[in-house]
Amino acid sequence: MGKTLKEVAEYLGGRVIGDENAVVGGLGTLDDAGEGQITFLANPKYAQKVATTRATAVILPPGAPGHGRNVIEVSNPYLAFAKLLTLFYVAPPKALGVMDGAVIGQGVAMGKDISIYPGAHVADGVKMGDRVTLYPGVVLYPGVELGSDVTLHANVVVRERCRIGNRVTVHSGTVIGTDGFGYAPDGKDWYKIPQIGIVILEDDVEIGSNAVIDRAALEATIIGRGTKIDNLVQIAHNCVIGENCMIVSQVGISGSTKVGNHVTMGGQVGVAGHIQIGDNVMVGAKSGVPGNIPANQIVSGIPAFAHRDWLKASSVFPRLPEHRKTLASLEKRVQELEEKLKADEKVK
């Protein structure tokens, strides 16, 4: 259903420049949007496309040229784009109840407007808030607790006693609360250390597909409020991840590491165990983090160090073979000069 630009602007907290009664019913890119759609400019390098877009309206930052188009000005066009996708395309879930083929254990407490699909398995003593959706193949072990507005996609597993907060989404194939990797050597074999702790996902966490978060050995592995974790991430036992972190695909964080708030880790970062990473740290892709990082640092490399220094060092790497030849030539020349000086001394 379409909305006027006035309605859209009110929803976004922006202002209309142009025809506030123009109607839009969807979004598109600057290149592909047409009549009846709205587009946005988030990257200044595409500003010239505003003049040629066929969209009915453009979302722009304050002061950006509109080239005669209908404009909605907002402080953050990219955030506005995300909100409009929700407005136009994300339908509120419809409560389906417990469908045939779902398995529900004894003593399960369920809130209102639940949807549990065929093939889901809810064990004894599970507690769920309102508007929880469990897709086929979801398995909740005994004693799991889910808040309200939780969505667990197909084949998610939540192990015993783990706790998930409100408005949490976990995507297909992820395991929450698998055993931590803990073994004690006895001089001959490895003795498994029972992992009796849990995992806690706080409110507004989202976790991608095929990620694994290990349960703590004794207490809790914690993922802080608002943190987003990409596909194929491994977080080991006893870790504490702060609030509003962004952890990209294939990151591995070793056990008992503490990560602060608003930390960003690029793809394939490896983090050692038993270290601390401060607030607002950014770690570049493929970095190896062997030790503590103070707050507000940007690091990259293997081992990770200051990002600017890493850029300088990495610019030298491709020329190392050439520099090695030059160094060998200089060493040879120095040796020749030293031998000549010795010969001259003997002559004197």
Swiss-Prot record:
Catalytic activity: a UDP-3-O-[(3R)-3-hydroxyacyl]-alpha-D-glucosamine + a (3R)-hydroxyacyl-[ACP] = a UDP-2-N,3-O-bis[(3R)-3-hydroxyacyl]-alpha-D-glucosamine + holo-[ACP] + H(+)
Listed pathway(s): Bacterial outer membrane biogenesis; LPS lipid A biosynthesis
E.C. designation(s): 2.3.1.191
Organism the protein comes from: Geotalea daltonii (strain DSM 22248 / JCM 15807 / FRC-32)
GO CC annotations on file: membrane
This protein's name: UDP-3-O-acylglucosamine N-acyltransferase
Gene3D superfamilies from the UniProt entry: Hexapeptide repeat proteins (2.160.10.10), MurE/MurF, N-terminal domain (3.40.1390.10)
Enzyme class, UniProt record, top EC level: transferase
Residues forming the catalytic site: 237
One GO term (biological process): lipid A biosynthetic process
Keywords in alphabetical order: Acyltransferase, Lipid A biosynthesis, Lipid biosynthesis, Lipid metabolism, Repeat, Transferase
Entry similarity comment: Belongs to the transferase hexapeptide repeat family. LpxD subfamily.
Subunit structure: Homotrimer.
Domain of life of the source: Bacteria
Job description of the protein: Catalyzes the N-acylation of UDP-3-O-acylglucosamine using 3-hydroxyacyl-ACP as the acyl donor. Is involved in the biosynthesis of lipid A, a phosphorylated glycolipid that anchors the lipopolysaccharide to the outer membrane of the cell.
